[in-house]
Amino acid sequence: MKNIKNIKFLFAFCLLPIFACADYLDKQPDDMLTIDDIFSSRPRSQSYLSSIYSFIPDEMEMQNNYNMLGICDEGDFIWAASWAKQINIGNWNTRSGYYDKWAQFYKGIRSATVFINRIDGNDDPTLSPDVRACWKQEAKALRAIYYFYLIRQYGPIVLMPETELDINLSNDELQFPRSSFEDCVSFVIRQFDEVLQSPDMPETYINDNDKGRIDKRTVMAFKARMQMLAASPFWN
């Protein structure tokens, strides 16, 4: 009987740390920012905007990205692991996944949409209205650029809602139809035109720290590429 009491006492004693730590475990770690945290601070919002650029492909990278010389007559790839080499030797099918950027570009589109819909709510006093408006146009241009890449690679694509989607939506609620090629091109051109007509987007940047950011010259270049693609006989 005494042993049973001792076991019960020991069991109850072992449970104390579990209940004592319950409140501690419920706390959110300091290094895990919420979306509201990001869009209540100028530096965090700027970092988020910079992260949207990360989905832009490096079209000069020879191994895994967009350089097509290796599967054309202009050259050949000797790297066995290269997807271009695998295509040349016929080692591919519809499920190979070579050159597949579908998910990458839609991640960029979603990130840009989140930024566009939330940046106006950033009331950090160090973030001026002019800078906020410029960033918003920058994100809009990035979103249109990712749509351009998708259209160039896949033809008619899914044009996502311009509002932020709830991540808890069911699979059925996330089934959006593909738009026609003409509608896709018109949407991208319209997005580029809105950025070009906006006084908030600079023609170019003077500050060295801003070099590499999208300006109106960048947007005009991508608009021209979109129009050339749409005019190509391959799409008519």
Task: Cite the ranges covered by each PLM segment.
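Short coil/turn linking the two alpha-helices of tandem helical-hairpin repeats
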Residues: 151-152, 158, 229-235
